Amino acid sequence: MSIIKALALAAAAGLLLTAPLGQPEARAKTKPAYSPRDFTGVYEGEFLTKLDFPYNERYGALFRKRQQDDIDNKPYDDPASHCLTSGMPAMMLSAGYPFEIFQSGRQITFTKENGSVRRIQMKRGHEGLDDGPLYMGDAIGHWDGDVLVVDTVNLRGDTSLERRIAPHSTAMHIKERIWRPSYGVILDEVTLTDPEAFTKPWVHTVKLTRHDEWELKEFVCDNNRYFLKPDGTSAIRGLAPVPR
């Protein structure tokens, strides 16, 4: 028997002795490969912990009134209470419902489980727009390296900056820089400028967490909407009264 053949047989015998019968070979754990320009998938946003918008005197007074009305459970006639979309920037600045991102060379689409849909156009500019104002505004995007830069204008003034109480005007302008620093995270740096409501721009970075095991479920707004009780306060169908 040659030396090479003997060494090969010895090595094979060693493998058989060290690998328990019926046990799969151990494999090193590796992080999933990803492209920083590929945003497709299901993500969960996050709630704002501080509503520190730089309001001027007029809009600051309106904001404080809405805050107190919300604390007192007084009805507020916002679009969401009529099963309408929360619009921008609330879609990106609030949590509660996950959203799925679909992507092509022409358009990037954010679809939220509550029915809100945001489309970022990648092949045109704002010129020639004859619609509006719009709940989601007119969003135009382009790539700056691996960062998606989005410019949004032409927004309605009856939506909120977050869930339902923070006002803004139709002059609001949204700029975003969106990037994917790791497989499971997208970061969205949002800059809001509103010369009618703010004294200066407001900047905040939102973290979006990826969930590969999630899928969006059917949502019917009428099953979850607010309604007015006989005493004029608001409630949500199906929820037990909150003790006070």
Show which residues each predicted segment covers.
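Intrinsically disordered, low-complexity terminal tails
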Residues: 2-3, 8
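PEST-like low-complexity, intrinsically disordered acidic/proline/serine-rich tracts
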Residues: 3, 19-244
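Bacterial N-terminal signal peptides
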Residues: 8-19
